[in-house]
């Protein structure tokens, strides 16, 4: 008989410590990004997405910390029903974050491939409406999935309605992944292989690094929880190792996004003694780096 997941808790204590550290750092970084974009900086189409992505990452990391506490409670209270309920809540910000990243990549791709059409047919509040829809849709998907698959039970159910709900959830995640990959590849092809060389901006580099970070660190979480978790009947030692690996990589991914923003905003920057507000603002400027640096140098030239 396979052991419950928590009985492998005596193994690999170092990854658990790493996960806690990355989650705390990620929560702090995403909270700073959310505060600056929400209350200190002028928002544009892309900053609205990044603000909501930071919020989704923060909520996801917070949910993971609470989930870890609930996992400890199951040791003393095996019949704890809150774990299944909280699993639904934890899934919402993850799907919302993936949706935000797909929307950012798609909108950036459209702005590069069809710049005139994008400027003429992009209403002012499109990003806000899209973000609202992105939050509502994962919430509905997760609630319906838990309703058809026993709302307070995360065990796999062979009911036809549950199977259909699981299939729709996986299809939705696969759709987001395909959109993310295709839009990113199209953007890279236009930037490096298209006719007429385009200047790289900090915004392009930031989005590409964020997408790359998700593909390397965030995708295993999707594979485990939405593909393998319901297929296997129980946990074994290999499952626990893979489980811990997905949590470490996911924590790194959510922690890396704010680091990418601030690193790219300050990298090769001419201004000294920058504030976090100035660094984040430079990331959101959709202007070539050379032109940006020339403007900054002209500002620093002393007037006669």
Curated annotation (Swiss-Prot):
Q: Does the keyword Cell membrane apply?
A: yes
Entry keyword Cell membrane: yes
What biological function has been recorded for the protein in this entry? Orphan receptor. May be a receptor for RFamide-family neuropeptides such as NPFF and NPAF, which are analgesic in vivo. May regulate nociceptor function and/or development, including the sensation or modulation of pain.
Record topological domains on the Extracellular side: 1-18, 67-80, 145-172, 230-244
* Residues passing through the membrane, by range: 19-39, 46-66, 81-101, 124-144, 173-193, 209-229, 245-265
Which UniProt keyword terms apply here?
A: Cell membrane, G-protein coupled receptor, Membrane, Receptor, Transducer, Transmembrane, Transmembrane helix
Q: What is this protein called?
A: Mas-related G-protein coupled receptor member A5
Q: Which residues lie on this side of the membrane: Cytoplasmic?
A: 40-45, 102-123, 194-208, 266-304
Describe tissue expression: Expressed in a subset of sensory neurons that includes nociceptors. Expressed in the subclass of non-peptidergic sensory neurons that are IB4(+) and VR1(-).
Membrane topology per the entry is: Multi-pass membrane protein
Which coarse location class describes where this protein primarily resides?
A: membrane
Q: Where in the cell is it found?
A: Cell membrane
The GO terms this record gives for MF are: G protein-coupled receptor activity
Q: Give the protein family.
A: Belongs to the G-protein coupled receptor 1 family. Mas subfamily.
The cellular component terms of Gene Ontology attached to this UniProt record, alphabetical and capped at eight, are: plasma membrane
């Amino acid at each position: 008989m396979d052991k419950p997941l928590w009985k492998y808790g005596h193994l690999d204590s170092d990854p658990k410590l790493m996960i806690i550290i990355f989650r705390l750092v990620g929560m702090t970084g995403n909270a700073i990004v959310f505060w600056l974009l929400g209350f200190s900086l002028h928002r544009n189409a892309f900053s609205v997405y990044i603000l909501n992505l930071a919020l989704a990452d923060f909520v996801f990391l917070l949910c993971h910390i609470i989930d870890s506490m609930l996992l400890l409670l199951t040791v003393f209270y095996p019949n704890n029903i809150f774990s299944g309920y909280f699993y639904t809540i934890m899934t919402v910000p993850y799907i919302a974050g993936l949706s935000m990243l797909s929307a950012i990549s798609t909108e950036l791709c459209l702005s590069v491939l069809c710049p005139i059409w994008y400027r003429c047919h992009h209403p002012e509040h499109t990003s806000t409406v899209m973000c609202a829809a992105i939050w509502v849709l994962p919430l509905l998907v997760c609630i319906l999935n838990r309703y058809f698959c026993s709302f307070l039970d995360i065990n796999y159910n062979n009911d036809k309605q549950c199977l259909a709900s699981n299939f729709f959830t996986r299809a939705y995640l696969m759709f987001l992944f395909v959109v993310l990959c295709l839009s990113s590849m199209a953007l890279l092809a236009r930037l490096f292989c298209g006719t007429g060389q385009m200047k790289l901006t900090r915004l392009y580099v930031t989005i590409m690094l964020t997408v790359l970070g998700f593909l390397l660190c965030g995708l295993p979480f999707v594979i485990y929880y939405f593909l393998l978790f319901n297929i296997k009947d129980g946990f074994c030692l290999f499952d626990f190792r893979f489980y811990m690996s997905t949590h470490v990589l996911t924590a790194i991914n959510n922690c890396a996004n704010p680091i990418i923003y601030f690193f790219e905003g300050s990298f090769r920057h001419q201004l000294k003694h920058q504030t976090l507000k100035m660094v984040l603002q430079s990331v959101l400027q959709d202007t070539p780096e050379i032109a940006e640096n020339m403007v900054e140098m002209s500002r620093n030239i002393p007037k006669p």
